[in-house]
Amino acid sequence: MSNEKYNIERNFTDMTQWLETPLGKNLLDIETSLLEQMINRRFGYHLLQLSCADVAVYEDSPIGHKFCLTPSTKVKNGSLVAQAEAIPLAAEAVDMVVLHHVLDYSSDPHQLLREADRVLIAGGYLLIIGFNPFSTWGVRHRFGRKAGKSPWKSSLLSSLRLSDWLKLLDFKVEQIHYGLYSLPVNSPGLIRYSSLLGKLAQRLNWPTGGIYVISAKKQALAMTPIREPWKAIPSKTKGLALGDNASIAPTQQHKKTLH
């Protein structure tokens, strides 16, 4: 196993364990609440989630076929095993893509976004959940990265920077919601107290929350009005997928440059 693959799987395992802590559970509760407002009225055939941990944050979606891409086979919610920067699906294969903190931990966030764009149909939705660098959580990340422990070893991208990248890829950013105004401390009492203080900020959607959720619609026109049946890319190298096996296959990159 290469060092890069080992680090990806180790980060995945560490984040899965951290999300079982009081602070991690509070984070997931708030993220689920914010996502519910964005996905419960979005319809389609297929939803793909890429997450930093073994969790499913798409339960409120009415889309029938929901599945996860993970870096490891030792998961509960994994349906497709591959690297996030090389999604083994055909172009325009899914109606919605959910990126759950994967950009925070990606070594190549530009390529990851290009892959999400490639597999998403025209008119489909991309939802991005990330840690906000302009928050108390962002400060904690800045001083906690040297310790090398999850979730503080991630590299944070601001919602403004991601919005610029999405525009270059012909996405229309429709909503940005902020949340998690509680202090980043693993104490149930302090979490409850600071959450109460943050209710006004949540109501006003202040851009100082610990997380953000971006909803963006793909604007590019489809090449053909006839939609082909959904399928993964076949290859001699097998991967794990729903139904038929799928595998990691090289994909063509968009030529647009993200800065």
Indicate where each model-derived feature is located:
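Class I SAM-dependent methyltransferase Rossmann-like catalytic core
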Residues: 1-40
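Short alpha-helix
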Residues: 143, 153-176
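Conserved catalytic loop of SAM-dependent methyltransferase domains
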Residues: 173-199, 207-208
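C-terminal lobe and adjacent flexible extensions of AdoMet/dcAdoMet transferase-like proteins
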Residues: 196-259
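Conserved class I S-adenosyl-L-methionine
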Residues: 125-153
